[in-house]
């Protein structure tokens, strides 16, 4: 009976969009997206705390080491544009000689999630101009553990929790106006 609850009737899972907060965090953001895609939810904040990144950002070898520490196998590849469709997706792609993005799909358009901009679509020609030929396939190993998605702080949840204090705030406001 419990197996029925785990069934998912979608054609593919979605890679969550996780935006980088600093210019040097594109690699960490890509790892957080792929780790979360497989069910181990990580934030850039927790990855930054656990694995320091230089001010220049992450190298491919840094990403491989960090992926290994969160029980993800990885395989760096050098490839041509026509080989993109053979990659295990989602994967990390190196573009513009200094930036990592997550490759989500390869069809008539190439769909990537850029940690600095969000979801983007490129034509084959557009993508060939920025693609450096480097990819990093990532997938869970046998020790990989899924975790619960942590609730993200939401300002409106805070207001809802403070609703019981609303009468007190209104008395204070009235006193402030009167005095």
PLM features: what roles do these ranges have?
Residues 1-179:
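Membrane-integrated ABC transporters
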């Amino acid at each position: 009976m419990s197996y029925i609850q785990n069934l998912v009737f979608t054609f593919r899972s979605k890679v969550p969009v996780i935006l980088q907060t600093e210019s040097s965090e594109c690699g960490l953001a890509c790892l957080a997206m792929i780790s979360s895609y497989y069910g181990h939810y990580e934030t850039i904040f927790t990855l930054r705390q656990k694995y320091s990144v230089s001010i220049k950002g992450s190298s491919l070898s840094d990403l491989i080491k960090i992926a290994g520490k969160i029980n993800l196998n990885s395989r760096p590849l050098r490839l041509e544009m026509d080989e993109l469709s053979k990659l295990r997706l989602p994967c990390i792609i190196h573009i513009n000689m200094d930036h990592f993005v997550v490759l989500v799909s390869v069809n008539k358009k190439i769909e990537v999630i850029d940690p600095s901009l969000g979801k983007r679509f490129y034509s084959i020609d557009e993508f060939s101009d920025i693609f450096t030929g480097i990819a990093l396939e990532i997938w869970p190993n046998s020790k990989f553990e899924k975790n619960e998605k942590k609730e993200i702080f939401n300002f409106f949840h805070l207001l809802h929790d403070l609703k019981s204090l609303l009468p007190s705030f209104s008395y204070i406001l009235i006193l402030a106006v009167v005095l």
